[in-house]
Every structure is written in structure tokens, then in C-alpha cells.
């Protein structure tokens, strides 16, 4: 848990350090709100990519639990493996949707 907190501290300090540089790129258009919209696009993209990170974390947990289940009951390995693969494919769809939404936010919005 402390490594997750360390990672979030590094990310937040990086954002704090680079926020003025990002805002200064559109300093001329801050009066009409375009600069804030520019910042909002990238903040929104970062939030959508949190879904992809959560998917990766949960896929690791589900795979670890499947390995433990097979270790406890080796006869059930084919059923556990097929169920795990279907579950991981459905979970990966969420990460792909998050990536698509992020790309749309950056290039279309």
C-alpha cells in the first residue's frame, strides 16, 4: 500500500510542477476559457486512464486467486482456467474502452 501512495505522490508532484507550463501554452486564450478546457482535456484523460490501471490491478488479483485455486484443487484446472480467461477478457474490455475514451477526449473534444 505504501508503494501505491508513493506513486500517487510522485504523480501529484509532477502534475503540480508542470501545471503552470501546460497553462502557459494557451495563456493568450485563457480569457475565453480555452486554456481551462485544454487543461480539462488532459485531466479528464488521466481520470479515464485510472480505469485501465484498476483493471490491471484486478486482473492480477484474479489471476493470483485462480492460481491458488488450481494449487488447492488441480482436478478443477480446466474449468477454472476457462472461467478466468472469460473474466479477464471482459475486464480487459473496460481498459480498451477507457483507452478509446481517452483518445477521443484528446483528439476530438
Swiss-Prot record:
It is found in: Cell membrane. Its main location: membrane. It is a multi-pass membrane protein. Gene3D superfamilies: F1F0 ATP synthase subunit C (1.20.20.10). GO terms for cellular component: plasma membrane; proton-transporting ATP synthase complex; proton-transporting two-sector ATPase complex, proton-transporting domain. InterPro entries: ATP_synth_F0_csu (IPR000454), ATP_synth_F0_csu_DDCD_BS (IPR020537), ATP_synth_F0_csu_sf (IPR038662), ATPase_proteolipid_c-like_dom (IPR002379), F/V-ATP_Csub_sf (IPR035921). The chain crosses the membrane at residues 42-62, 88-108. Pfam families: ATP-synt_C. CDD domains: ATP-synt_Fo_c_NaATPase (cd18184). It comes from the Bacteria. The record marks 92 as: Reversibly protonated during proton transport. Keywords: ATP synthesis, Cell membrane, CF(0), Hydrogen ion transport, Ion transport, Lipid-binding, Membrane, Transmembrane, Transmembrane helix, Transport. PROSITE patterns: ATPASE_C. One of its GO terms (molecular function) is proton-transporting ATP synthase activity, rotational mechanism. Belongs to the ATPase C chain family. F(1)F(0) ATP synthase produces ATP from ADP in the presence of a proton or sodium gradient. F-type ATPases consist of two structural domains, F(1) containing the extramembraneous catalytic core and F(0) containing the membrane proton channel, linked together by a central stalk and a peripheral stalk. During catalysis, ATP synthesis in the catalytic domain of F(1) is coupled via a rotary mechanism of the central stalk subunits to proton translocation. Dicyclohexylcarbodiimide (DCDD) binding to the active glutamate residue inhibits ATPase in vitro. F-type ATPases have 2 components, F(1) - the catalytic core - and F(0) - the membrane proton channel. F(1) has five subunits: alpha(3), beta(3), gamma(1), delta(1), epsilon(1). F(0) has three main subunits: a(1), b(2) and c(10-14). The alpha and beta chains form an alternating ring which encloses part of the gamma chain. F(1) is attached to F(0) by a central stalk formed by the gamma and epsilon chains, while a peripheral stalk is formed by the delta and b chains. This is ATP synthase subunit c.
